[in-house]
Amino acid sequence: MGKRESYEAKTTELIQPVVEANGVELFDVDYVKEGSDWYLRVYIDKEGGVTIDDCQNVSRAFNEILDRENYIDDQYIFEVSSPGLTRPLKKEKDYEKSIGRMIEIKLFSPVDKSKEYSGVLKEYDKDTVTISIDDVTKTFDRSNLAMIRWAFVDEV
């Protein structure tokens, strides 16, 4: 396990009780380098969406743990936020919650001469994802998915 994965795993282990105590769920943890800066990002979610107060409460509580445990060698910036309107689908529960939603898919290899699709998620299993595009059903191999996330739909 590399440094990045190790820090993400340790953060996940340590923050789980904090998010539960604050009435939210852990969506994801990322430890990434952008430019010359390292970022430890914790994404939280709850039914109806998270508030700034939710993020602030988790951040304050976990900062104390980060200071005490001191398991990250690099200097880093710690952030807590929502996964956003165009959240990625990473875990099985993300797929389950997304049935009937508009999603965007980017593929590693083109299917029917395209690498990008948008449609309503109809079903999924461990190997495939099926979406409906203008009443046409299309199934993709999950191994070919470079990215799958909620599509931003402006309902004005």
From Swiss-Prot:
Q: Does the keyword Cytoplasm apply?
A: yes
Q: Which SUPFAM superfamilies match?
A: YhbC-like, C-terminal domain, YhbC-like, N-terminal domain
Q: Keyword set for this entry? A: Cytoplasm, Ribosome biogenesis
Q: Which GO terms describe its cellular component?
A: cytosol
**Biological process GO annotation list?**
ribosomal small subunit assembly; translation
The free-text function statement in the UniProt record for this protein reads: Required for maturation of 30S ribosomal subunits.
**Full protein name:** Ribosome maturation factor RimP
Origin organism of this chain?
Lachnospira eligens (strain ATCC 27750 / DSM 3376 / VPI C15-48 / C15-B4)
Q: Which gene encodes it?
A: rimP
